């Protein structure tokens, strides 16, 4: 898949604000500060399209980006961030779960996992949830540039042991662009 055009479409705080289900949706989900926004910016080649922050929990809404006029990339709030209040964490969790359960337009879910901390309990729970719902998902191991070759191989093996039903695993670096072409090629199977 080649990305020709990428624009911010809308943010929503409740399922009632979601756009019509006219385009396939590729969903980006992962722990807080795993690099979802950086990955979106890297994939699209549009710096600042998705707002990035070194502060976990920055994304608090469901953010839609229209790609090539006929696909949505959907950035969900991160899970696992402890510094927000219980009520806010419950709201994010309910929004995330309800969206994944009910949205028919979801073509693929990308579970972003920090390569330095593979297979954390919250990531395994997300994969189990997606498998329970029979949602196709791929795993993106982010921050690949921060690992040595030996660490990278060990992290990949560990991730593979927990994700037998993943459609693919891609090691990705938003800094260098490593994995970008591979990931975009996978999208072809889910957006046609």
From Swiss-Prot:
GO terms for cellular component: cytosol. Residues 22-192 form the EngB-type G domain. Its cofactor is Mg(2+). It comes from the Bacteria. Mg(2+) binds at residues 37, 59. Keywords: Cell cycle, Cell division, GTP-binding, Magnesium, Metal-binding, Nucleotide-binding, Septation. One of its GO terms (biological process) is division septum assembly. Transmembrane segments: none annotated. GO terms for molecular function: GTP binding; metal ion binding. InterPro entries: G_ENGB_dom, GTP-bd, GTP-bd_ribosome_bio_YsxC, P-loop_NTPase. GTP binds at residues 30-37, 57-61, 75-78, 142-145, 172-174. Necessary for normal cell division and for the maintenance of normal septation. Belongs to the TRAFAC class TrmE-Era-EngA-EngB-Septin-like GTPase superfamily. EngB GTPase family. This is Probable GTP-binding protein EngB. The gene is engB.
